[in-house]
Amino acid sequence: MAVGLLVLGTLGGVVAIWAAERVQVLGFVPGKNGVPDGWELFVNVGEPDLALVQDGEGRALKLRTRASSFSLQRKVAIDLKRTPFVVWQWKVTELPQRGDFRHRATDDQAAQLYVVFSWEVFRKEAIAYIWDSTAPEGTTARIPSPALYPFLNLHVIVVRSGEAERGKWITETRNVAEDYRKLFAANPDKIQGVMIQINSQHTESRGESYWRSIRFTP
């Protein structure tokens, strides 16, 4: 689940977001080679399957996985003192079979939103907001650092779980600053990166999700 986070440090250009009012931080508009403008594609396993499509009221980013793992990443500079809330819209239409982030062998999700606070060599911190197939809503856990990335400090929050809301557009709101304080026992400064990820390689199954805007608000 966490491998793709490390690539954020290589992306060029930082998008600074400083505003007193509500700001649409990250949207999805056509770019090169099918990747939305301003984002960078990172492939972990298999072939990526993504497209910008018309869905309901407007454009959406569609991600599909077939025993694959890939992410879209973007560097930003977001002041959490001014805009501590993240608001996003997502829809899951297919969940990886038996997916459960609590076990390495089944750690697959159709929709994952990462906010990255630091990717310095010796200090990598992030929170992942996920839609899990099995783990109950509200579950939180710190993911053990893999041997290749001993300085990664990743916490997971299950925002949605299972089939009950499948096929529905849902708007989520999280107080990122508050979540950080609870999970890291410290005060956050800013967000340096955002990542959307989908994977199903562990369960060798399939997953599909749709995304609209991601905003940070007062």
What would you call each of these model-derived segments?
Residues 2-13:
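Bacterial N-terminal signal peptides
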Residues 28, 194, 212-216:
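Extracellular beta-strand elements of beta-rich domains used
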Residues 75-86, 163-166:
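Extracellular/lumenal carbohydrate-interaction signature centered on repeated Trp-anchored short motifs
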Residues 89-95, 118, 177-179:
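Solvent-exposed strand-to-loop "edge" motifs in beta-rich extracellular domains
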Residues 108-113, 151-162, 166-205:
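Extracellular beta-strand ligand-recognition surfaces/modules
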